[in-house]
From Swiss-Prot:
Residues 82-85 are annotated as: Involved in Mg(2+) ion dislocation from EF-Tu. Belongs to the EF-Ts family. Coiled coil: none annotated. It is found in: Cytoplasm. It comes from the Bacteria. PANTHER family: ELONGATION FACTOR TS, ELONGATION FACTOR TS, MITOCHONDRIAL. Signal peptide: none annotated. GO terms for molecular function: translation elongation factor activity. Associates with the EF-Tu.GDP complex and induces the exchange of GDP to GTP. It remains bound to the aminoacyl-tRNA.EF-Tu.GTP complex up to the GTP hydrolysis stage on the ribosome. This is Elongation factor Ts. Pfam families: EF_TS (PF00889). Its main location: cytoplasm. GO terms for cellular component: cytoplasm.
Length: 219
């Protein structure tokens, strides 16, 4: 068992706002891993961030981010509790980081609860079919499929994606850190990601025909 030092307890307390004993218990349960201990506190509703999530967040900002010379654009709405916080540098910086994440990582939904049931069912079906193709035992197909769906969530649900600036953190962790630091409930409400030409068929013309047209040989 990992030794839990006073410094570790203090660090977790400063990060989460939870009590000293709760922090020590969480660290013990997590084997000394600070990130896992933070998750333990959140699940038990003991962290400051967890306590703030029930508060209404109706202020905030809608921000845009344009990447790669105008080829990718993002609009995102992030909510907080007060207009004062919405105008702060810390909150505005957070919104920009989230917009950049969306541009870089191409999520489809904010959280897993938004994924349509038919999409989840299809992913399960595909995962099972792949497992059968690999001659996996029928008894473990469900477990394999569930694992594949979890991976699907981590790839396409924004809150579960690895942060592009630090892949040891998920976006949920980034948000939790911001809540603890800023002191208000913060929620990512919705986003839209645009890619130039996405869904359009580019017209492919024959090179010889293009030359002929340029030379005035074809009408």
């Amino acid at each position: 068992m990992a030794e839990i030092s006073a410094k570790m307890v203090q660090e977790l307390r400063e990060k989460t706002g939870a009590g000293m004993m709760d922090c020590k218990k969480a660290l013990t349960e997590a084997g000394g891993d600070l990130v896992k201990a933070e998750e333990v506190l959140r699940k038990k509703g003991l962290s400051a961030a967890a306590k703030k999530t029930g508060r209404a967040a109706t202020e905030g900002a809608v921000a845009s981010y344009i990447h790669m010379g105008g080829k990718i654009g993002v609009l995102v709405e992030v909510n907080c509790e007060t207009d004062f916080v919405a105008r702060t540098e810390g909150f505005q910086g957070l919104v920009k980081e989230i917009a950049m994440q969306i541009a870089a990582a191409s999520p489809r939904w904010v959280r897993r609860e938004e994924v349509p049931a038919d999409v989840v069912a299809k992913e399960l079906e595909i995962a099972k079919a792949q497992a059968r193709e690999q001659k996996k035992p029928e008894a473990i197909l469900e477990k394999i499929a569930t694992g594949k769906v979890e991976k699907f969530y981590s790839e396409f649900c924004l809150m579960e994606q690895a942060w592009v600036k630090d892949d040891k953190k998920k976006i949920q962790d980034v948000l939790t850190d911001a809540v603890a630091k800023i002191g208000e409930n913060i929620q990512i409400r919705r986003f839209a990601r645009f890619v130039l030409g996405e869904g359009l068929e580019k017209k492919q013309e024959n090179l010889a025909e293009e030359v002929a047209k340029a030379a005035g040989l074809q009408k």
